[in-house]
Amino acid sequence: PVIFLVLACTIGRFLIGLNSLRKKEIGFVSKITSKVSYYLDNKGKHFAITGVLFAVVFPFLPFTDRYILDVSIMILTYIMLGWGLNIVVGLAGLLDLGYVAFYAVGAYSYALIATTFGWSFWVCLPLAGVFAAFFGILLGFPVLRLRGDYLAIVTLGFGEIIRIILINWYEVTNGPDGITGIPRPTFFGLPFKKIVEDGENSFHTFFNLEYSTMHRIIFLYYLILILALITNYFTLKIRKLPVGRAWEALREDEIACKSLGVNPTNTKLTAFAIGATFGGFAGAFFATRQAFVSPESFTFIESAIIVAIVVLGGMGSQTGVVLASIFLIGITEMFRDLEQYRMIAFGGAMVLIMVFKPKGILANRKPTITLREHNSKWVKHY
């Protein structure tokens, strides 16, 4: 215990020194992080195109194996969750510590509908989003007058309420045992299974390929990649619409919003509902990927990780969410074999980011709209 105490004090003193170094704005680390942030902020479109192209060819690179693809699918899932929460926290400025509840609602909605009615993934996916949006509105109404710490406490309680309901409502959710036998997604009706019945086609028989378990993994990778890109595209588009500008205005000054005719009630409910919808989509994907869901998959630590991704990436920054997800989830996976050190590595990574970049990796996001003078007239630039 004495050794660990001395080690903790040493690390703490080192971090304090790093913080002092940052305040004095000296040292190569602060310069490097500033240049990287500036490049990503001003060259974001080129960076995004390069990243998407790399993600498309990633499954076919020589070093990509099943483990790397599984980790990539996990990272993409957290990226999608981070983008969904970014609407609520980053754009609208509503601190939500119970976002995992919408993740759980989407997963259980998909699991119950698919196992009860036998509907396909493509039918159940939008329904999972609708149910999650309903719970988002259900949460939004009681917290309309709350902000800051009070809002965080209520949303935290909401997440725990959902988890406890899933544990105790045994007749519907099967309690802590969870739901098994959840159908896997198919490629336009072609299942990814080795043995097929007479007259039935599977993916490998239809395309005359040798059966491989990697086919399903690659399909799941592209599925979550498409869902994440849709989430990003929708967020980028909606933030330029009046409702998106209302979110950002609400984040900065709610009183000023009211004076300008913005309805805070509708604005908050819209943010909660849309953010919850994408959480529900991610939950549906999680359920079909695992083919099993249980309440232990939706604990508070999941909400904490998602919030950490949004905050550490930079409030309102889409690219920052990607970088923070890769960094934080990658750190925890590197220490998977050292279970007792995983959270230490996760916490250390968070501390280091907060020391060098207290406002997030990409804190200086460009405004949604800028006014520039052109031929003696003010014009809008998006």
Q: Where are the regions a protein language model picked out?
A:
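Transmembrane alpha-helical segments in multi-pass inner-membrane proteins
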Residues: P1, G84, V100, L125-G129, ...
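Membrane-embedded helix boundary and interhelical linker motif in transport proteins
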Residues: P1, L91-L94, G98-F141, T186-F206, ...
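Cytosolic-side transmembrane-helix boundaries in multi-pass membrane proteins
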Residues: P1-L53, F187-K194, D198-S202, E252-E254, ...
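Helix-loop-helix "hairpin" substructures at the membrane interface of multi-pass membrane proteins
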Residues: G44, A104, T213-S294
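Single transmembrane alpha-helix segments in multi-pass membrane proteins
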Residues: D65-F117, L138-T155, W247-S259, N263-P264, ...
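Alpha-helical transmembrane segments of multi-pass integral membrane proteins
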Residues: D70-M74, Y99, A107, A111, ...
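Residue-level recognition of pore/gate-forming positions within transmembrane alpha-helices
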Residues: M74, Y78, A104-Y108, G129-A133, ...
